[in-house]
Regions:
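C-terminal and inter-domain tail/linker signature
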Residues: 1-108
Length: 108
């Protein structure tokens, strides 16, 4: 894991990337996650998607940069795993609300 100074819910998200139940505690109850155009609304949908993605891709994310982008935190991440094009750089846009992730958008 990198030594970036990530806000707590973002750091917790990356620390628990292979533990969907723990990841669910990083999100607000009505959080929305978008992964390459696919939308997941609510904790149960997010948890199910993350469990499936973890099992399928065995991805490991290494945050390498963070910056403010409007009302979001943009984290640039190097991701390796069992998928075509690995390793690759992805952008994770987090919008935080009351110390939890309210929205997360993952794009190339």
């Amino acid at each position: 894991m990198s030594t970036l100074n990530l806000p707590e819910p973002i750091a917790a998200y990356f620390a628990a990337e292979h533990h969907p139940a723990a990841l669910a505690h990083c999100f607000t109850p009505h959080a929305v996650m978008t992964d390459f155009g696919h939308h997941y609304a609510g904790i149960d949908a997010i948890k199910a998607f993350l469990a499936e993605a973890s099992a399928k891709y065995s991805a490991i994310s290494e945050p390498i940069a963070i910056e403010r982008e409007g009302g979001c935190q943009l984290v640039r991440t190097r991701v390796t795993g069992n998928f075509p094009g690995s390793p690759t750089m992805l952008s994770y846009r987090f919008r935080l609300e009351r110390g939890l992730i309210a929205t997360l958008e993952i794009t190339a």
